[in-house]
Amino acid sequence: MSFFGFGQTAEIDIVLNDAETRKKVEHKTEDGKKDKYFLFYDGETVSGKVNVTLKTPGKRLEHYGIKIEFVGQIELYYDRGNHHEFVSLVKDLARPGELSQSQTFDFEFTHVEKPYESYTGQNVKLRYFLRATISRRLNDISKEMDIVVQTLCTYPEINSSIKMEVGIEDCLHIEFEYNKSKYHLRDVIVGKIYFLLVRIKIKHMEIDIIKRETTGTGPSVYHENDTIAKYEIMDGAPVRGESIPIRLFLAGYEMTPTMRDINKKFSVRYYLNLVLIDEEERRYFKQQEITLWRKGDIVRRSMSQQATIAAQRYEGSNPEPTSAQAKEETD
């Protein structure tokens, strides 16, 4: 046997028990690309196998224990190196000793709490992953496998429309209305704009969907605004009494649910920004926050009962009967 057991090393592979049947979804990585990951919901069990393959047959691998962890953590990019863990579960797979041959270890994390949605933003990343580690004297051997978590909501009981009047005194007076204040990610924003007074020459009007990511607290707060969509309402001059309909489909845009004060580290909010431009290129705008949520087609046949029970309800809504949840819905 070589000194300190350096002559032997190993490869680790993590395989989920339901890897062949579990759904995969695309998720943005830190470099802006997209990869596919296994999808989980709050309350679902995470189980599988850790395969340890010795690279050099006939040589033993000394170790100080083998373990697997399930971790949920938040990383703020301006504070790299400090990972804020909000879920940390550990299973010991083997006590300190030696491995004389390749070996497979089973693991199971039962009904795991996954309170937040996976998110990769401009200044923050929230991720869930499994990490298997062979502890050694000087250099541990480890392998990570990321998963994606999505949070589900039922229909909010209170979902009032948005009605506002905006304008410039004696020049412009507009009344606009959106049919709801809370929309699921594949919803349609329906509304109208009514011109009560028009004494300036408007040449263009649009609605923008603005995503605002806020990270940090106190003096160290960072805001990142990103225009997700631009929807042209009109190109030309409106007249008094004119009413313009709005119909904006959200399904074609890449958005997440609204995330408020996640673990006291960050928020993601969405706004409808009504923009008017006059012939002198002056811009007038009015912003209104909306809430986005992931529609819980809560009981699809492919979804486990435990995930159904754990599916998150929209905050502030009252629990609905289980029978109501059991209706299959299509996006």
Curated annotation (Swiss-Prot):
Pfam families: Vps26. Keywords: Cytoplasm, Endosome, Membrane, Protein transport, Transport. GO terms for cellular component: cytosol; endosome; retromer complex. InterPro entries: Arrestin-like_C, Vps26-related. Residues 310-331 are annotated as: Disordered. Its main location: cytoplasm. It is found in: Cytoplasm; Membrane; Endosome. One of its GO terms (biological process) is intracellular protein transport. It is a peripheral membrane protein. Acts as a component of the retromer cargo-selective complex (CSC). The CSC is believed to be the core functional component of retromer or respective retromer complex variants acting to prevent missorting of selected transmembrane cargo proteins into the lysosomal degradation pathway. Retromer mediates retrograde transport of cargo proteins from endosomes to the trans-Golgi network (TGN). Component of the heterotrimeric retromer cargo-selective complex (CSC) which is believed to associate with variable sorting nexins to form functionally distinct retromer complex variants. Belongs to the VPS26 family. This is Vacuolar protein sorting-associated protein 26B. The lineage of its organism: Eukaryota, Metazoa, Chordata, Craniata, Vertebrata.
